[in-house]
Amino acid sequence: TICYNHLTRTSETTEICPDSWYFCYKISLADGNDVRIKRGCTFTCPELRPTGIYVYCCRRDKCNQ
């Protein structure tokens, strides 16, 4: 699987996920008055943390844009 792995305000970059890491994720986190978005590969879909706004998890190449 190929996933985007850039942060909110950086240029788009991708990574090839390690074997058995089938999911791409996109998570938004509240940071004071700002919202940060984090992307990457994962073995299982991440859970929403108290500072999180949403989590998106998918299994297709570059699906976490």
Swiss-Prot record:
Coiled-coil features, chain-numbered ranges: none
UniProt family annotation: Belongs to the three-finger toxin family. Short-chain subfamily. Orphan group VIII (haditoxin) sub-subfamily.
Matches recorded under InterPro entries: Snake_3FTx, Snake_toxin-like_sf, Snake_toxin_con_site, Toxin_cobra-type
GO cellular component: extracellular region
UniProt-listed CDD domains: TFP_snake_toxin
Tissue-by-tissue expression: Expressed by the venom gland.
Pfam family, one: Toxin_cobra-type
Signal peptide: none
GO molecular function: toxin activity
Function as written in the Swiss-Prot or TrEMBL entry: Antagonist of muscle and neuronal nicotinic acetylcholine receptors (nAChR) with highest affinity for neuronal alpha-7/CHRNA7 nAChRs.
Keyword set, alphabetical order: Disulfide bond, G-protein coupled acetylcholine receptor impairing toxin, G-protein coupled receptor impairing toxin, Neurotoxin, Postsynaptic neurotoxin, Secreted, Toxin
Protein name per the record: Muscarinic toxin-like protein 3
Quaternary data: Homodimer; non-covalently linked.
Disulfides per UniProt: C3-C24, C17-C41, C45-C57, C58-C63
Subcellular localization, as worded in the UniProt entry: Secreted
